[in-house]
């Protein structure tokens, strides 16, 4: 695909470029996904996660922008895998945009078929928040990583944080780049292996990473120094994960916690094989794709073997949902799934109570709007000290990329309260412009992904994909501003179906009513999904009489 010259930045301020704030939010967040401070490769429309794109091609992007500017307040724009294909008269409470990305009939949902169709310009990989226009940079995954490590500390070490511990992990891309800050926010020290020096420098620039080196011995010295001084430190190590993990194993050096957040789900672009630089890997891939993939598999297996050895010697390890174990299994490592998945190990209890990665974006572009919302949450949610601790840490330490945004894990009930609070702040002028409210697709009731979010469900319903479709339909009829249904995010083609939404808080009474409906329905179906699978905490919420009914209670 031909690259596009010039940078894209979302408009700021109160001036509309469209016919309503719903359309304006879609326009600004589409553009924000391609801001060079946000996107992985904006010239090629790639936002994050291997080849997760915001639009199919530049012609489609330009058409989407054109249609959003013309779209009436009672019309809906249809996006088919990153391409605008129709505008229909609907209602003012209908979504302004409906997005469906990367759907393939199951029998054909393989990497080979999908990427052939993609190369022919017939589909697009949207990851989770790339093609649904609600990616907010590395902060988007930061709290999930923070929450995972916090839950690990409580479960494995019986502590509130990881003070005195050190973490070995890899990957400093658009998702993995959250790891160093999440590690130090949990008061641990970390060595994060990354093969691409540019990604290391980007995390240093964004203040997610403290320091870096290209020497394993120096990284270990810095780690020991940090542990001795009691000062949590994140150390980027330029190198290949397979090589580094294997060397540590041979040195008999065992981390307290070990993981991986490379884009291993994408065998072509997401994992550089051992012995290659980013540039030499690209040249090899171009000349011999099959040979390249074999090398990738061999490196993933080598890294996974080291992780299993670390586990045998006391490390707490987890797969962070990037399909790393599956790739190791495909590469011939039969016991790859002895590495536990992070959701059943640490996050499932949060999903069961309707909690997940909730986020909001200041369409004004003014960071003060986010800080004012932070302060309001600290004031009004005193009964949730964990939430308040996160908001205070994020306010102090998170560097905004593109439009200012905030993410937090908020549960059923809390999301509606936060949404209504934000709408009221817009109404009374405390916040200078409308705010877009949404979430990751990685959430309580919006995803079927047997290798990640729905791994080891209590009733065996890991692969049941009705729930994300019900979630999307429910959010659409409840009044979300836009709704998306995607395939393959996080764990790759054939492995996940998931849905998302965005709703705009513009301060109006209409927005208030839509917020009430959507922010009750969206986490509510997550509670039902887990209650239906037999989770007691979900059943207890339903017994307390929420704003929905579950026929079996």
Swiss-Prot record:
Cofactor(s) this protein requires: NAD(+)
GO molecular function, one term: urocanate hydratase activity
Homology family: Belongs to the urocanase family.
Biological or metabolic pathway of the protein: Amino-acid degradation; L-histidine degradation into L-glutamate; N-formimidoyl-L-glutamate from L-histidine: step 2/3
Biological processes annotated in GO: L-histidine catabolic process to glutamate and formamide; L-histidine catabolic process to glutamate and formate
GO cellular component, as recorded: cytoplasm
The UniProt record lists the keyword Cytoplasm: yes
Alphabetized SUPFAM superfamilies for the sequence: Urocanase
Entry EC number(s): 4.2.1.49
Active-site residue numbers: 408
Protein name (database record): Probable urocanate hydratase
Superkingdom of this protein's organism: Archaea
PROSITE patterns: UROCANASE
PANTHER family found in the cross-reference section: UROCANATE HYDRATASE
Listed HAMAP family: HutU
Coiled-coil segments: none
Gene coding for it: hutU
Catalytic activity as recorded in UniProt: 4-imidazolone-5-propanoate = trans-urocanate + H2O
Binding site for NAD(+): 49-50, 127, 194, 240-241, 261-265, 271-272, 320, 490
């Amino acid at each position: 695909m031909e690259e596009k010259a010039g940078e894209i930045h979302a408009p700021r301020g109160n001036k509309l470029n469209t016919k309503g704030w719903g359309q304006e939010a879609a326009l600004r967040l589409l553009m924000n996904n391609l801001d060079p401070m946000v996107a992985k490769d904006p010239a090629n429309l790639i936002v994050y996660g291997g080849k997760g794109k915001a639009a199919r091609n530049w012609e489609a992007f330009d058409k989407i922008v054109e249609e959003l500017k013309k779209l009436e307040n009672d019309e809906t724009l249809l996006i088919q895998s990153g391409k605008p294909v129709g505008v229909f008269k609907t209602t003012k409470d209908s979504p302004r945009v409906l997005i469906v990305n990367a759907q393939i009939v199951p029998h054909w949902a393989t990497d080979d078929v999908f990427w052939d169709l993609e190369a022919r310009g017939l589909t697009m990989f949207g990851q989770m928040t790339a093609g649904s226009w609600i990616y907010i940079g590395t902060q988007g995954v930061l709290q999930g990583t923070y929450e995972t490590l916090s839950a690990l500390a409580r479960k494995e070490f019986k502590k509130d944080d990881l003070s005195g511990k050190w973490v070995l992990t890899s990957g400093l891309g658009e998702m993995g780049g959250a790891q160093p800050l999440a590690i130090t926010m949990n008061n641990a020290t970390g060595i994060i292996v990354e093969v691409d020096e540019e990604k290391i420098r980007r995390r240093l620039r964004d203040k997610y990473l403290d320091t870096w080196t290209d020497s394993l011995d120096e990284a270990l010295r810095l780690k020991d120094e940090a542990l001795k001084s009691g000062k949590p430190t994140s150390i980027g190590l330029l190198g290949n994960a397979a090589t580094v993990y294997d060397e540590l194993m041979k040195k008999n050096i065992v981390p307290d916690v070990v993981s991986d957040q490379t884009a291993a789900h994408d065998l072509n672009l997401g994992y550089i094989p051992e012995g290659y630089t980013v540039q030499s890997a690209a040249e090899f891939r171009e000349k011999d794709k099959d040979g390249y993939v074999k090398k990738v598999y061999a490196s993933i297996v080598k890294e996974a073997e080291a992780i299993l050895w670390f586990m045998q010697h006391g490390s707490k390890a987890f797969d962070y949902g990037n399909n790393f174990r599956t790739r190791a299994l495909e590469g011939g490592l039969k016991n790859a799934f002895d590495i536990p998945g992070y959701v059943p190990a640490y996050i499932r209890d949060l999903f069961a109570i309707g909690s997940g990665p909730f986020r909001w974006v200041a369409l004004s572009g003014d960071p003060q709007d986010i800080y004012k919302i932070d302060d309001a949450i600290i004031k009004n949610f005193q009964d949730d000290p964990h939430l308040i601790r996160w908001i205070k840490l994020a306010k102090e330490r998170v560097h905004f990329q593109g439009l200012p945004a905030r993410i937090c894990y908020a549960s059923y009930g809390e999301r509606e309260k936060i949404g209504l609070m934000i709408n009221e702040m817009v109404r009374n002028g405390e916040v200078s412009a409308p705010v877009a409210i949404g979430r990751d697709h990685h959430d309580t009731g919006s995803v079927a992904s047997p290798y990640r979010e729905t791994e080891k469900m209590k009733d065996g319903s890991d692969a049941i994909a009705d729930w994300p479709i019900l979630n999307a339909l429910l959010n659409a009829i409840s009044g979300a501003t836009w709704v998306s249904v995607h395939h393959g995010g996080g764990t790759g083609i054939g492995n996940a179906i998931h849905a998302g939404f965005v709703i705009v808080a513009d301060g109006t009474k209409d927005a208030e009513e839509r917020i009430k409906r959507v922010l009750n329905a969206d986490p509510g179906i997550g509670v039902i999904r887990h209650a239906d699978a037999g989770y007691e905490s979900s059943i207890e919420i339903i017994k307390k009489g929420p704003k929905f009914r579950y026929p079996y209670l």
